[in-house]
A protein has these predicted regions:
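Membrane-proximal, proline-rich intrinsically disordered regions
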Residues: 16-60, 226-227, 236, 250-256
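Sec-dependent N-terminal signal peptides
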Residues: 4-13
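Short linear capping/connector segments at secondary-structure termini
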Residues: 27-31, 84-87, 152-160
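Proline-centered turn/helix-capping motifs that create local helix->coil transitions or kinks
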Residues: 20-21, 57-61, 69, 140-149
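TPR/Sel1-like alpha-solenoid repeat signature
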Residues: 130, 203-209
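Short, surface-exposed recognition loops and adjoining beta-strand edges that mediate ligand/DNA contacts
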Residues: 60-71, 150, 188-204, 215-258
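Conserved, well-structured interaction surfaces
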Residues: 39-43, 47, 51-55, 75-144, ...
């Protein structure tokens, strides 16, 4: 009898060590482990990534591009060109906050391989993720040059980012180029319909990035400037050939803005 009692107690004690029930996920609420299974799951998640894109406004690009003139708003990025920007002594988190966005993109990218999608569908959503991640890394590249390269979801230990190694400008630019070239080849040509990221959007960003990086390297005496400038020429020519006119009638655009 004593042996049976010891056996029963041993079994009960062993069952207490099984804490698998603590790892169960809510049946009615999506989680990172359950929300990325189908094509529509990724489509729904990707909608939230569009918020990083700038809103459209008349003349807004004049204040964020390479144009510099006296009437430009005082807070615009053109102040870099006019040499009116001063570097603050204290820490500025503005650009580093882009990493919280990059983490959201990486969260989607990390779940693609384990989904139920076909290989073609996986390549499409990987392309969408690469577009958005490249878009934000281009901002970091233009502001800092070399920065930490993060292509996966980090652990809760913040030192992996804050105290992690700083990748070189060559490495960051190379990753952006590689990701956008992959996206150009694999994204759905027409995206998910109107006002969604498609092949032309990827090509436009690729052209813009390569022109920026190629000219920066050329005029700062860095290597591989021709690599980026040739790629800019190639993809720009294809865009122009595909879309020779942005609008059928330019007057219609003027009437719209007026």
């Amino acid at each position: 009898m004593r042996k049976y009692l010891i056996f029963i107690c041993t079994v009960l004690l062993a069952s207490c060590l099984n804490n698998d029930f603590l790892e169960r996920y809510p049946l009615g609420d999506p989680t990172a482990e359950t929300a990325f299974e189908t094509y529509d799951n990724f489509k729904a998640y990707a909608w939230g990534l569009y918020e990083t894109l700038p809103s459209l406004g008349y003349g807004s690009e004049n204040s964020t591009d390479d144009i510099s003139y006296n009437q430009t708003r005082g807070t615009s990025e053109s102040n870099w060109i006019r040499k009116l920007v001063t570097i603050p002594d204290k820490k500025d988190n503005t650009s580093w906050n882009y990493y919280s966005y990059i983490r959201r993109v990486n969260l989607m990218l990390d779940r693609i391989d384990g989904s139920k999608m076909t290989d073609v569908e996986k390549a499409n959503w990987r392309s969408v993720g690469y577009f958005f991640r490249s878009y934000r890394y281009l901002s970091l590249l233009s502001a800092y040059g070399g920065v930490p390269w993060i292509d996966h979801v980090l652990s809760d230990d913040e030192t992996e980012l804050i105290k992690g190694p700083r990748a070189s400008r060559d490495e960051i630019a190379g990753h952006i180029l590689e990701d956008l070239q992959f996206a150009e080849k694999n994204i759905n040509v027409n995206g998910e319909g109107r006002n969604t990221i498609n092949k032309a959007c990827v090509q436009a960003l690729l052209s813009r990035f390569c022109l920026f990086e190629g000219t920066w390297r050329k005029y700062h005496g860095l290597n591989n400037a021709e690599t980026y400038l040739r790629e800019c020429k190639r993809v720009s020519a294809e865009l122009i050939q595909t879309y020779p006119n942005v609008a059928d009638c330019y007057d219609d655009l003027s009437v719209h803005w007026n």
